[in-house]
């Protein structure tokens, strides 16, 4: 028979320390009565040693009066009241325990995570000129709030219906001191935070697929981003990445040539002051060489020559390149989408969005799109990149970093914001005061967008990584289990025989996983694991917005903008 004992839960040690504590408390009660009682009755204290005093009282050689008894009772009541008060406070500030909380006691705590607690985080923020501690992460199991600082970037992996929006996205948006950019495929995050954010700055909602049923009251010109051939290539990459179906087969030649062709047409339209609709027009007229002349006149002869070569290619080859390019730019065929990226018609009033102006204030931009066929994801990605790069330009102009950090909450990043270069740029943005939080539903989602090595690079570049449960990918969970580490326990074996009687042996070198794959796959709702640079993995309790300090403000925003709540309240 063998019984494992985790060293963090040594029963014998608990009993020993409990006895010591009881002796100390009894000593305090006794000596308080002895010393104070003697002072009140004018008697002299015959012993300063509590043990000697107790022996004296028992033998009758040391004074003990009615006053001593009363004082001892009062001290006992005060100590009991204090203990009850501390217990009640802990009970009031803690959530019900779960099956993984015992494992949490063997993970990061105390000095290991002190830099994420409010006091240390606030001191670090003030060094950067910011008066708030950072993005809220969660609370420790003992109830202390943890924050991600204003130089950190985050990656979160939460499975479906695990509370990522209520516990991470919304609290992070509300905590932002400067501009905010949010991507999503649902309207809930907009309804919950719009009313709060509009009190500090302008709110822009980009909703070309009517996710939140928001009308096109403004527009953005994607070609305003295209200032040279490099930016044109970047924009073409966003179209290519955002339009490609998961698992779709690609041809290296046609894909590359189509992307170059699309980039050339984007550059030509931008340099000629044309709307983005002209790009798709050129893609449907395979022998139209208007763009070739524009590129030559704009000083891009090599790019013009490349376009001319594609136009002059054999019909099948030319058709293949143009066909792939049209597929990449497919979102430009939607009239609803084009309303958001083309100038207003005569008599129509729609303000033009300017990324450089946006990042200078405490403004908010919500970027909404659906995934799948007809997605506006390429434009969501393009506008996201335009805003982040505008923030970077401002940071450089200000000496290296933004005075008020900008928060980019990339919720559903793998579905609606497929920014291929993000892993290569991630760690750089934190130093600029651009705080990016990429939220995924699984590790494999990231692999689809960035590839296996790209996803590893993104994960490694993040200062704060949060796993919120709900994932069943054993390889990923196995790596998390290894990062969390092992606990050491003693194995007690008792054997018996008629000849020698019973014998007891202890093996103190046993190890096991603190949380194994099955534990992580079944992580209870309300619990998450935080991996912070320089600290052990930490078990935390998630804090939904409705239990936080901004609950009333969020409820007011929902009452104003959430159609379901408006109907429930008797509205239209």
Regions found by a protein language model. Name each.
Residues 20, 378, 413, 453, ...:
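A short glycine-/small-residue-rich loop at the edge of a beta-strand within enzyme catalytic domains
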Residues 13, 44, 60, 83-84, ...:
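Acidic, low-complexity intrinsically disordered regions
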Residues 426-529:
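Conserved ATP-driven motor cores of ASCE-family P-loop NTPases powering translocation/secretion/packaging/pilus
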Residues 1-162, 166-169, 497, 570-572:
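Basic- and hydrophobic-enriched, low-structure N-terminal and domain-boundary segments
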Residues 19, 50, 66, 89-90, ...:
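Intrinsic disorder/low-complexity segments enriched in polar/charged and small flexible residues
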Residues 49, 138-139, 273, 442, ...:
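Glycine-centered flexibility motif
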Residues 25-38, 141, 145, 150-434, ...:
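P-loop NTPase motor domains
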